[in-house]
């Protein structure tokens, strides 16, 4: 394979979702084994909100929530912070390689309000459940934490309500029709594409250099950034978005991304299991009403906003300004949750047990239960897809006729 063939096939074209999500599952497994924590983003975004408040004299470090997730240090001294910086760098490099960066403004104020309000709801719900589509779902279920299953089911339900809500007439933006005499060909500016590809390579190797230099003195921080670059490349090139996995299932019947996510978790689970058997402590959270309520809010919020925590990150660096607002909403929502945490934490979270399936059913039993639940989820998704298109077929035939 020549360089030009490799460049076009792997650096410019989008990647197939299933192999990319499986790769993300494998990468997240090694990330857990090396750093001792799971792939997650909203906890760090919450710390950003807390530290912004500190700049204005607010003693956020005294809040109970920040005593749990720790507010010490800065993004440059925390594993999650370095990983997220790596993710942004990886996303941006991948977008530049494909010349997929263009400033795109929201078409209406309604979309901006959707982004901010949906982002706030999603951020609040994610931190209420102690995790977003990553820590309380994609990387939470392979940790064998029961709370992640509560969150996943609630998120699916919340996304159904979100899908129905966003189909209301108020969210329909008028489309401006323009008469044309012929289709406009899709074109790119070759010089611009070359410049951006080189800039993407500069950013990519710059991030790698930064990570390796950091790893010389602080191995976990440097490796966290390397993993972040990998995660960023995967989510941007494969356009991995958990919002579309849920929303598309309800609205269009498409389940390709949802099935990819299930398979990715199945691949990750056995790897996490092996690390746990070697003595690494899994990340188990409270299996209380917080997981259910947080999932409902998160599922509704991501569909209203149009993007989840990973989805808004790669779209933001592609120049889609709508997702800048979603990200801002996420930080605001998670910070609001941190402020009110002490008021309802005992009733909704901390008085409830942290249930580890590997301890409840034994190591092999917990692994088997997890795979049975994943298989059940996959069968339900396939069943829903068949039912959706079976019901849609008569209507489609009627419209064609």
Where are these regions (language model features)?
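Membrane-interfacial helix-loop segments of redox and metal-homeostasis proteins
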Residues: 1-401
């Amino acid at each position: 394979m020549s360089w030009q063939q490799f460049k076009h096939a792997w650096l410019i074209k989008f990647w197939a979702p299933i192999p990319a999500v499986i790769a993300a599952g494998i990468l997240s497994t090694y990330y857990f084994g090396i750093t001792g924590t799971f792939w997650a983003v909203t906890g760090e975004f919450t710390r950003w909100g807390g530290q912004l408040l500190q700049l204005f004299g607010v003693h956020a470090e005294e809040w109970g929530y920040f005593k749990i997730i720790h507010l010490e240090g800065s993004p440059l001294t925390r594993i999650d912070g370095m990983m997220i910086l790596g993710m942004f760098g990886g996303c941006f490099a991948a977008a530049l390689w494909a010349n997929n960066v263009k400033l795109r403004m929201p078409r209406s104020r309604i979309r901006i309000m959707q982004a901010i309000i949906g982002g706030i709801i999603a951020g609040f719900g994610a931190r209420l459940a102690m995790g977003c589509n990553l820590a309380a779902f994609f990387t939470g279920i392979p940790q064998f934490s029961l709370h992640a299953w509560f969150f996943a089911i609630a998120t699916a339900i919340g996304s159904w309500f979100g899908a129905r809500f966003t189909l209301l007439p108020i969210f329909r933006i008028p489309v401006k029709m323009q008469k044309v005499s012929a289709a406009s060909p899709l074109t790119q500016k070759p010089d611009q594409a070359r410049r951006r590809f080189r800039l993407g390579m500069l950013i990519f190797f710059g991030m790698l250099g930064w990570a390796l230099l950091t790893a010389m003195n602080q191995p976990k921080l440097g490796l966290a950034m390397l993993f972040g670059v990998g995660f960023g490349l995967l989510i941007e090139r494969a356009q991995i978005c958990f919002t579309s996995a849920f929303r598309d299932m309800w609205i269009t019947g498409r389940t390709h991304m949802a099935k990819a996510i299930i398979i990715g978790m199945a691949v990750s689970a056995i790897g996490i299991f092996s690390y746990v058997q070697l003595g690494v402590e899994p990340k188990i959270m409270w299996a209380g009403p917080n997981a259910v309520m947080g999932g409902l809010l998160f599922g509704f919020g991501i569909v209203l906003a149009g993007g989840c925590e990973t989805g808004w990150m790669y779209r933001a660096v592609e120049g889609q300004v709508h997702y800048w607002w979603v990200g801002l909403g996420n930080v605001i929502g998670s910070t609001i949750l941190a402020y009110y945490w002490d008021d309802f934490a005992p009733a909704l979270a901390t008085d409830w047990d942290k249930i580890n399936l590997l301890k409840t059913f034994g190591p092999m039993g917990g692994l088997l239960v997890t795979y049975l639940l994943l298989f059940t989820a996959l069968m339900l998704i396939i069943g829903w897809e068949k039912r959706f298109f079976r019901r849609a077929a008569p209507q489609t035939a009627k419209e064609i006729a």
